[in-house]
């Protein structure tokens, strides 16, 4: 009913002088036509945008984990990062997710019913359109069952208000998801006619993930079967062996805003630069950024982003998760350098004191001339590093060390919930203005890199460790610094490496 309401709303926005006799009448029969089916599919995809249209999926999936923790600002820190008493069933994020996803499921159910009943659609159109709606319904149910467990399972369209929904067993929900996706994987096209539409490989990837999730249960009764790992591997390999996708050669390319829709994206939720059609937009560019505009030589701009400081990488992520010497993904995932963009706040060399004690005096032998600019517009203004100085962050020794640099220097001890290396994954410099929150960057939900990992885990659980290692090494080869590639200078300055262009793959492969 939500699709019809939306179309009726747009139709009712015409000027009041229109004759009622000429007013358009919209009925559900419209969805039995090809134009109506296309409109229904487009509307249904809109529900997939919800997760990044605000502080939503990032809060549900990252806060309170061992990978990211709370930043300096935000209202979800107590409830989702600390699991304090503020986390209640009536929380706004949970309510919004429930409402959005069940609206999408309702639309999909109605559309599927109308597609089945249509006498006007070509059989080929009916089969493909029905499969596409099944993909969307399964996608939404998979989100819900992972978040809430037992949930109402609605598979038929409802044209009347209902309040008698009962929660179904988790196993039943998984059975519907798998049934929907198996049909979608069989009947969707190999290549989408429009960017952002699902393909049989989108369905196969999601199906592999669903089987792996179901089969990984230890105590939960998800309906898991002994064949779940076989099914995971089967569908993951359909994607891998299709030839339809390829890993990006350089990990950095994944985050290049000019490289959207690249060969590695198996399914990505789309947005647009047209405000009228962008809904809430993709707002993830706001939440992973460090404060920078208070530093000398800097002002807030589009390229560096609008820093809401919601999420900061944990100590585990920064210090323990990566083999930083050999794995290029670490240094390619964060922003380490900012370049001066504000001539009015360029700093000069000067004597500095704290609490009455002079801790720094410019040294002319180092080119530090009292009153002269420390750097120019376009030069490095901020530099974050992983250097461990051994100095306390609030000591005169640390203040002296930092003052000796031309730029604002942040060694490891100076990283905080306000100042930290920003995650570059969601940056969106395509926004029309600095203050614009609604970004247009695509939200990649499925990547070939993940497909390889799904296959590797399934193979490992089946005891085929050679195959698991083979798939893992495909990912690790891309993760390594490539032969001929210039490494980040921190590799030899602070990580104990050397300044060379040799591949580090041998150190990473299993």
Residue ranges of predicted features:
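Conserved, well-structured interaction surfaces
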Residues: 32-52, 73-148, 162-175, 180-195, ...
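C-terminal motif of bacterial Sec signal peptides marking the signal peptidase cleavage site
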Residues: 10-13
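An aromatic- and glycine-enriched ligand-binding surface/loop that stacks and positions planar moieties
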Residues: 15-76, 209-392
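C-terminal substrate/ligand-recognition segments
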Residues: 91, 340-478
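Short coil/turn linking the two alpha-helices of tandem helical-hairpin repeats
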Residues: 143-146, 150-152, 192, 213-222, ...
